Amino acid sequence: MIAAIGPMKGEPPMALYELRTYTLHVGKMAEAVKLYQDLGFPALRKGGQDKKLVGYFQSDIGTINQLVHLWKFDDDADRRSHWAAVFANKDFVEGFVLKARPLLMTQEVKLLHRAPWGPHP
């Protein structure tokens, strides 16, 4: 018998992880990292929208030129509320997004829920 995948003990029902992968144009990684460090992340922190962030990552092997973010939300309503606040943050949108967008080739967003085994980030 296979166990159903669902919330773990102590987890809110339907906790979601959002994996956001941004593929950059070749040669633009250093510029993108600088924008995130100088403008993007400080704007999120100032607006209080950094609390759901698990981490930022850069690809190294396989598909390269990617920046990856992992976010953790209590449920879909929490996720939607978070992104509404992010995109209402003028420092983030006008100071960062408008400068970062031309560096991007593609954006991929995956919603994930935790399996009932393994580490619990």
Features from the language model and the residues they span:
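Short S/T/G/P-rich N-terminal loop/turn motif that feeds into the first structured element of a domain
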Residues: M1-P121
